[in-house]
Amino acid sequence: MLFTEILGQEHIKAHLTQSVNNGRIAHAQLFVGPEGCGTLPMAIAYAQYLLCKNTENENTGGNESCNLKFNNLSHPDLHFAFPVAANGVIKSHPVSSHFLVEWRELIEEQPYGNLFDWYKKIGIEKKQGQIGVDEAQDIVKSLSLKSYEGGYKVMIIWMAEKINTQAANKLLKLIEEPPNKTVFVLITEDEEQIINTIKSRCQVLHFPPLSEEIIKQGLINKYSIAEDVAGKIAHQANGNFNKACDLVYQDTEDTQFEEWFIFWIRSAFKARGNKNAIHDLISWSEDIAKTGRETQKQFLQFCLNFFRQALLMNYNASELVFMEPKSENFQLEKFAPFVHGNNIIEISDELQDAIYHIERNGNSKIILTDLSIKLTRLLHKKAS
């Protein structure tokens, strides 16, 4: 993968290439950035620059046969680990090596893809993937071997926040004192979920969200769409190129999430003193509970963002509002006055608590019903 194929992040490209040119390569690095900012493509381009001894701050000019191997991510000294779970084909002890064909397809099709895209790709969208102890054993085994081409070995661990405790304990010593010429690149969207004993052993690089202009140019170059359309999509994407690509194809799950959200909000408004609306909320909770836990977490995160957007609209920060509801009968401007300083913190806390409990395998129907009843009270709270 060429550095020129990666949108923006020029200061990070310069830092990484200079560190290789100067021979100052940290053995463990943590790339931290929000979805769609390019952490994974950057890690792959960095690995190529390092393994192929490229020059001129680009992935050319070095070992051409090595560069060719990176075209289909088949270099023997490039290793990947990522969250997995058992599916219809792999029934037990799933590890990343079982899913490399699908992984390469995902990077070819959606290098800026998110965790949910990956779960859908391997058919585990109703499960929660993890990087477990079997994966840790595979990592230890693969990195104990000598490098195939006599140079560096690179281990890219994508979504490192999904490393469970047992795997983290097994990897700790290896990350602290890796074999000679071994580089770990851990990638995360949530730095706080990385255990401190691992984070403290890594050099941390923070990736900012992409600017609207960079996303706009990326969309024009990739899809040849009109500049004004690309500009509108870039604004809605809020720094996330993966979301921008989904919006081009109208392939975003946000459309379904918006329908669920609007029904939920309307039922919550009606539920005060209306028994029938309470039944609607319970039925809604049952329907959402039938989806996978990853879908539920994605949806609740969408709700969190929707409430924040409404708050910004209510306090006249319209330039920061990027959401545009597709429903003809729902207007953000009319909903915004019900989200204010007197209830937003409680709403946010309740949503984050629900995400926490769902992630830890709580009963989704009970969690969502409880959240719905609390939302009914909070939406009727008066602004102070």
Annotate each predicted stretch with a short phrase.
Residues 2-162, 166:
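Clamp-loader machinery-focused feature within the broader ASCE/P-loop NTPase space
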Residues 141, 173, 200:
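Conserved adenine-binding aromatic site and its adjacent loop/helix in ATP-hydrolyzing domains
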Residues 144, 169-183:
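Conserved catalytic/switch belt of AAA+ P-loop NTPases
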Residues 154-158, 171, 182-188:
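Structural recognition of the conserved hydrophobic beta-strand(s) that form the central parallel beta-sheet
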Residues 165-169, 297:
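Conserved strand-to-helix beginnings and helix N-cap segments that scaffold or border functional pockets
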Residues 1-69, 180-183, 189-302, 306-384:
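Charged, glycine-rich active-site and insertion segments that engage polyanionic ligands
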